Structures are given as C-alpha cells and as structure tokens.
C-alpha cells in the first residue's frame, strides 16, 4: 500500500502541523481499510451510542419500578395503620371487660364496634393485596432490563475485541512474542482456569496493553 509521506513540520508552522495530522489520519484510515478493519471499527463506534441509550432505558425502567413500589407501599400504609390501631384498641377494651365485666349497654357497644371492625378488615386487606400485586408486577422490568444488559455486555465485548484486533495486527516487531501469546484473546476468554497458561480475560488484556506500553 502506498502511504503518504509525512514531512517534518516547522516548529512554528500551524499549517505544517495540520498537514502532518491530516497525513497521519489518512495513513491510519488507509491502513485500517487495507486490513479490513475499517467497517468493524465503524460498527463498534456506532454501537457506543446504542449502548448508552440502552443503559438509559435500564435506568428509566428501574426508576419507574422503584416509584411504583414506593407508591404502593405509601398507599397501603394507612390501611395497615388503621387496622393495627383499631385492633389494639378493641383488644384493650375486651381485656378490661374480662377483668371487670361492664354493663350490658357498654358490652353491646363493644360487640358492635368489634363487628364493625371485622366488616372493615376485608376491605383493608383487599386494598393491600392489590398494592402488593402491583409491587410484584412492577418487578417485570427485570426481564427486559436483563436482556438489555446482556446486549450491552455483548457490545462492550465486541468493542474490546475489535480494539485488541487492531493492536495485535499492528504491534511492532519487538512485540511479536507477546502478540503470539495473546492471539487467543480474539477467540474470547477461556473459562477453564485450571488449564496451564490460562488466566482471566481481563488479566490477559492488561498484560497485552502493558507489553505495548499503554
């Protein structure tokens, strides 16, 4: 491939500096095109905004689910508090009646209040059950966000793979041995760490970058 010559820039010449940067940029683009990596890098770059949008979606869905759950809890709390308060009051009145039996008229009032409380309980519990169901339904975001997060991880791994490919295809001669040792990176990490020479994928990446001086 014919590469454009890069002329030394005069120290004070902005035009020469711009020309040099332009030549370097053109040389890089031509090299990527010759290696067949220009499209892969472009696809990886396009995936970054998509991943950001997906992450925003996960945040929004999580926030909506949290808000629904909190609203349901806040709506249920008064019903639970009312039942608790009334139950304690009735229990105290019945305990006092057993300790010191009261007049028939007072006893009738106690029975009437107790019956009213029992009639009100199903309404409170029905409302609370509906709120609990809404809390449970709010958790369905996990299925959707789980799929989105998995897709984002695939995108991140693909970007890393493409960047590693560029490095491995363009490292200098003195780095040939580290290149051979790290060629397995392009096939993804090996899970069986019990095998000799196998390390975690991130460690492999770090070793490669260290060997290249990054």
UniProtKB/Swiss-Prot annotation:
It is found in: Cytoplasm. GO terms for molecular function: phosphoprotein phosphatase activity. The keyword Glycosyltransferase does not apply. Keywords: Chemotaxis, Cytoplasm, Flagellar rotation, Hydrolase, Protein phosphatase. The record marks 147 as: Enhances dephosphorylation of CheY-P. It comes from the Bacteria. Signal peptide: none annotated. Disruption phenotype: Cells lacking this gene display a strong clockwise motor bias; in combination with a yhjH disruption and overexpression of ycgR, cells switch from clockwise to a counterclockwise bias. InterPro entries: Chemotax_Pase_CheZ (IPR007439), CheZ_family_phosphatases (IPR050992). GO terms for cellular component: bacterial-type flagellum; cytoplasm. GO terms for biological process: archaeal or bacterial-type flagellum-dependent cell motility; chemotaxis; regulation of chemotaxis. The keyword Transferase does not apply. Residues 184-193 have a biased composition (Polar residues). Residues 176-199 are annotated as: Disordered. Its EC number is 3.1.3.-. Homodimer. Interacts (via C-terminus) with phosphorylated CheY (CheY-P). Belongs to the CheZ family. Plays an important role in bacterial chemotaxis signal transduction pathway by accelerating the dephosphorylation of phosphorylated CheY (CheY-P). Acts on free CheY-P. This is Protein phosphatase CheZ. It comes from Salmonella typhimurium (strain LT2 / SGSC1412 / ATCC 700720). The gene is cheZ.
């Amino acid at each position: 491939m014919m590469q454009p010559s890069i002329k030394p820039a005069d120290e004070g010449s902005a035009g020469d500096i711009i020309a040099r940067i332009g030549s370097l940029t053109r040389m890089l683009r031509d090299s990527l095109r010759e290696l067949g990596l220009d499209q892969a890098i472009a696809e990886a770059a396009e995936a970054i905004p998509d991943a950001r949008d997906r992450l925003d979606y996960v945040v929004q869905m999580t926030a909506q689910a949290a808000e629904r759950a909190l609203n349901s809890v806040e709506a249920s709390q008064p019903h639970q508090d009312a039942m608790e308060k009334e139950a304690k009051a009735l229990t105290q009145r019945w305990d006092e009646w057993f300790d010191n039996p009261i007049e028939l008229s007072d006893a009738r009032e106690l029975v009437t209040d107790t019956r009213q409380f029992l009639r009100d309980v199903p309404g409170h519990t029905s409302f609370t059950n509906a709120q609990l169901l809404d809390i449970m339904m709010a958790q369905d975001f996990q299925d959707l966000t789980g799929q989105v997060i998995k897709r984002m991880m695939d995108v991140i791994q693909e970007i890393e793979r493409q960047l590693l490919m560029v490095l491995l295809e363009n490292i200098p001669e003195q780095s040939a041995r580290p290149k051979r040792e790290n060629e397995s990176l392009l096939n993804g990490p090996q899970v069986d760490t019990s095998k000799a020479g196998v390390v975690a994928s991130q460690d492999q990446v770090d070793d490669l970058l260290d060997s290249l001086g990054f």
